[in-house]
């Protein structure tokens, strides 16, 4: 038994505390998340559902050591205690696409008090293609569109999609050690990226993927039917060839794909703005002052990307909001005769 009252928090305890506050007080719902970085995202999700009757408090289960297996720790903490007044908010990882083939996947999908991102992680939504131009503007204060992020990520996704299906296939079959997420990530890296060489980067990527797909086909000669069936099923779950990037490992997408591309784009946009200042300055003092002012006004890429909230129209995000709406507004049961 926990030594502190806070060690034994449950949905029922929060419900009792809510009732003690009186009928007119707003109902408090605790939302447990996995890490500090997740608090801002889930606050943006849940704040739209707050009203005169309820509010959310997003927090970590801080009494536990979250440095190892934090996701499993979170699930163990809340699986027995969650309810209408205490919910768990987690990254989907592969658990959504595994569709109950593991105990954790079953918990994530079927527990009505566990909410997940549908996309692999929050980072995937922060990298939502239609929002990335706005990120470059926030970083550089230059609204010149010099790179088509949506087309690039569409081509990237279409290139990696066949191999992604193989990745899920191995996890569904329980043989993921033969082709791990790390193995997949090594294949789908784009290497040293340049704006001028973007097309060549995609072509090299396709070649690497095709080679690995052929290898996996040889290693699994009887998998064709189950592979094609899984491919169709994944489409019904939202994984289309053009949106695959939303479902790969979030840290890999963020750190190794999107940030390097954003750096190339933002560097060029900054130079473009600085060249404009140099051309238009009337005298050297004005030039120095304008360059200094502009330099102090620009922002770092990673913090801006982590605070990007331009994913509100992304399909996974819309599905997440629908889940929360249903939780807060359960359908009324028709009386039985």
Where are these regions (language model features)?
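Acidic, divalent-metal-binding catalytic cores of TOPRIM
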Residues: 1-337
């Amino acid at each position: 038994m926990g030594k502190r009252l806070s060690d034994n928090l449950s949905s029922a305890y929060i419900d009792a505390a809510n009732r003690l506050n009186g009928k007119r007080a707003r109902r408090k719902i605790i939302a447990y998340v996995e890490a500090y970085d997740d608090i801002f995202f889930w606050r943006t999700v849940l704040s739209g559902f707050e009203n005169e009757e309820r509010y959310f408090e997003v927090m970590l289960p801080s009494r536990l050591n979250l440095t190892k297996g934090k996701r499993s720790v979170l699930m163990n903490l809340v699986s027995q205690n969650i309810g209408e007044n205490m919910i768990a908010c987690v990254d989907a990882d592969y658990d959504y696409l595994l569709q109950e083939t593991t105990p954790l996947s079953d918990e994530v999908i079927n527990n009505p008090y566990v909410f997940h991102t549908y996309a692999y992680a929050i980072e995937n939504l922060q990298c939502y293609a239609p929002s990335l131009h706005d990120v470059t503007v926030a970083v550089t204060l230059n609204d010149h569109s010099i790179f088509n992020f949506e087309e690039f990520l569409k081509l990237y996704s279409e290139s990696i999609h066949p191999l992604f299906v193989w990745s899920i296939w191995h996890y569904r079959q329980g043989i993921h050690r033969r082709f791990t997420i790390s193995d997949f990530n090594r294949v789908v890296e784009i290497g040293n990226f340049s704006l001028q060489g973007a097309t060549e980067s995609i072509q090299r990527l396709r070649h690497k993927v095709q080679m690995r797909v052929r290898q996996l086909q040889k290693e699994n000669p009887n998998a064709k039917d189950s592979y094609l069936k899984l491919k169709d099923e994944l489409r019904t779950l939202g994984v289309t060839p053009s949106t695959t990037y939303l479902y790969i490992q979030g840290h890999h997408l963020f750190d190794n794909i999107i940030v390097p591309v954003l750096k190339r784009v933002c560097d060029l946009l900054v130079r473009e703005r600085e060249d404009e200042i140099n051309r238009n300055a009337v005298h050297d003092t004005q030039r120095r002052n304008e360059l200094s002012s502009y330099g102090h006004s620009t922002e770092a890429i990673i913090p801006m990307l982590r605070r990007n909230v331009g994913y509100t129209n992304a399909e996974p995000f819309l599905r997440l909001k629908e889940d929360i709406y249903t939780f807060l507004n359960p359908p009324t049961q028709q009386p039985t005769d």
